[in-house]
């Protein structure tokens, strides 16, 4: 018999039903479960696939550069970043005739184009790119890296070049190389690029390979470095009247500590950014020399972890046994990596708008909104993934003997306390927050808005004040605002920081009030509930009081028959599945809050947010309905405009989202009956019955149908909000 898909599982390949195809796709990347897999092949396959991943990333970023160079308007955008709309790429075939062609021909283009809301124009401009030729060069370089990555991936699958398992498990060498090489050297290289290329470009100096060695980034060259007069590099920074990209008002400093924003670009000072990367490089280069490898000096990870035993003996054996547990479990390592990356991605969302690093991006409101929302959603998916792999670790890799009485074992032993406390926190937050919103809603509905319960977030305002924000008047607590102590306290802050934090036109430390207090607690409810579901899923993955032998059923079992009082919906996979809905829900609240607060800030009517955000009808009417007006006006006498495509996507997103429920709220019997009826009709229809198939059609399993439903729900939800966000923001601000 010819080899059938999937080749990695002979059992599945012989399945006579369509289950073969779906289960084959579902387990294609679960290398551990494949036939003939060994630990060595598992590590080697994953290692090689990383190079493939890198190749795809380099190809994709190369495509961004290439399409902007070919079809974009980068050179004209550089001349006037605030008024020219950046073009992402052309639209080959604008449907719906001449009106569509006219609607989508903008940004100075000759034909229909898409506008870029990704911030790449601002990024490339900030790092010193100025011409289409620069973009093409970058695209070619990334293509070259992509090819190198593919070759490396192929090479490391050849017998001679396959690394051994011991190489993969050499934690100290990997730490040293990743800390020094990945973070240290790359940060140092980036500092070099900023100092040698980007900062000169911001001062009107065009540095490329042909004059790279002739143009000194600083008038005194390396002199101050070798004579120890490093402060000279910070003297004479760009003035507040500096015009970015020109020599007008430019200084000579390359490494500064100014704080705050460049007045014209509203972004962080490039010289501050270079200084930051140099400091990061120094720290990581040192950190990458701390672990013991061939030279017998430095820390051993195993010794470090084994030494971490809490004194007094009341907290067990601390980190004993963790080294082997983590080093031998890919799921544990992936869980840690995803948890870290998820947090960092959310921090990127937060910092990209509050402390913008790229020139003029703060004035491109649609891009700001798109980037914030994008990074928060990505963070949500990555963080839920961390718990999924944590649960798989407990099922497949956790060894109770090896971890006796250490922190891992103790987490499992007192899991009831953890889960019940999280549950209590979620219930408290949910009922109190909803209670306040509903009370305020009713007061508005009955025409007595003065009876709302409005709570000032005094602790958050105090924290903002402690960081130099003066508008709340917390200095009323001081005996004197002109004393030496007060003045000395002001000098702690960088001068630019105090200006920025008290300037109401940026997004740094936004002024907050009762509406913020409420939505903050709604978001806290979402975060705690999502965490509750995820933590419970991982801690109960091995077993619970109801089902002590759960680990024997694997990660994603649907049910264990009719016994035990019902065991459906309690696999670790089910917890992940439920948590994703809560995650999406939470990020919905986060992005609604961010977007509405910023729309009112940018339009100069912050009182709309402040007054309407304290009750539910305000959110529904003054945020969602008011801002979706351009998307739901259907056919009108004015025909097509450039928002029409978003209106269509808004509708389509709702359709995809609603389709999710078809899979989520119906069970296998319905689908099996439907499929058999369709197959019966097919076999009796002339012409159609010439097409035959070998696999007997069967319905998706319960778990698969849930996955399909979840995928439609998630994709539809995000599509819908993306269309709403981009259309409502670009409709107002361009």
Curated annotation (Swiss-Prot):
It is a multi-pass membrane protein. The chain crosses the membrane at residues 46-69, 135-158, 175-199, 273-291, 330-353, 369-395, 417-439, 517-535, 575-596, 643-665, 707-727. One of its GO terms (biological process) is photosynthesis. P700 is a chlorophyll a/chlorophyll a' dimer, A0 is one or more chlorophyll a, A1 is one or both phylloquinones and FX is a shared 4Fe-4S iron-sulfur center. Chlorophyll a B3 binds at residues 662, 670. [4Fe-4S] cluster binds at residues 559, 568. It catalyses: reduced [plastocyanin] + hnu + oxidized [2Fe-2S]-[ferredoxin] = oxidized [plastocyanin] + reduced [2Fe-2S]-[ferredoxin]. Keywords: 4Fe-4S, Chlorophyll, Chloroplast, Chromophore, Electron transport, Iron, Iron-sulfur, Magnesium, Membrane, Metal-binding, Oxidoreductase, Photosynthesis, Photosystem I, Plastid, Thylakoid, Transmembrane, Transmembrane helix, Transport. InterPro entries: PSI_PsaA/B (IPR001280), PSI_PsaA/B_CS (IPR020586), PSI_PsaA/B_sf (IPR036408), PSI_PsaB (IPR006244). Belongs to the PsaA/PsaB family. PANTHER family: OUTER MEMBRANE PROTEIN, OMPA-RELATED, PHOTOSYSTEM I P700 CHLOROPHYLL A APOPROTEIN A1-RELATED. The PsaA/B heterodimer binds the P700 chlorophyll special pair and subsequent electron acceptors. PSI consists of a core antenna complex that captures photons, and an electron transfer chain that converts photonic excitation into a charge separation. The eukaryotic PSI reaction center is composed of at least 11 subunits. PsaA and PsaB bind P700, the primary electron donor of photosystem I (PSI), as well as the electron acceptors A0, A1 and FX. PSI is a plastocyanin-ferredoxin oxidoreductase, converting photonic excitation into a charge separation, which transfers an electron from the donor P700 chlorophyll pair to the spectroscopically characterized acceptors A0, A1, FX, FA and FB in turn. Oxidized P700 is reduced on the lumenal side of the thylakoid membrane by plastocyanin. This is Photosystem I P700 chlorophyll a apoprotein A2. The gene is psaB.
